[in-house]
Amino acid sequence: MSSATPSDATPSDRACYVYGIVPADAPGPDEAAGADGFVGVGDPPEPVRRVRHGDVAALVSEIDPRRPLGTPQDLIGHARVLDAVAAGRTAVLPFRFGAVVRDPAAVTDELLAPQGERFRSALEELAGLAQFTVRGTYREEAVLREIVEQRPDIARLRAETAALPEDASRPQRIRLGELVSAELADRARAGADELLARLGPLAVATVRADPSADQPVGASFLVADDRWPEFTRATDELGADWAGRIDLRLLGPLAPYDFAARLVDAPGPRPWD
């Protein structure tokens, strides 16, 4: 969602990294995570604290602005802070990775003061909700075997191609690849449809993920706190139904990465209502 950039100011050896926005009276990330001295990005990473203004607060930690951001440890630290807050059942508006401002005063003056009301409204809508993301990957050999069994045209072309020298079978190989790719795309769409049909009723909002070669099926779900166990069980049941063909992975509770921007950028009724 929102991001912040360094202010035009005299360079300093310290700056504020901003993770996201929470209610001003929410527990800090160390309390939410049940661990003292909770840390985020940077080398070494500094403790995360809150900068409050009115009803909202920014989660920040100090960093050295001269050190480039973007290491795997930085990315993990950014998500770890936000997801710990979400797991503690605190509403949070996650910022994109890399939001940096000059100092705590700039956090207030440039971020919280001008946008505080929008942040407060969005946090109210996200209260009691967290994101769960479900990703599915194919068992490639099993799925290809199933395609050959269920598509006689593909099975015939595969047999014809195997019987020809490689140079002579190039057109057939290209056609075979096209047919298999199209069938995989159809199955990915059907899988995503079933995923949303099975799990969507347990969420207040859903976002279908764009399919990719390594993740053909996936979606994110905004789930009420009291339905987390039910959602987890339903995901396990779907995974059991798909066992041997598609491996499901459930991530969550997470900060609402796929939903927060729609609230802040589109004031008014919740986009999913």
Predicted regions mapped to residue ranges:
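An interfacial alpha-helical scaffold signature
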Residues: 1-273
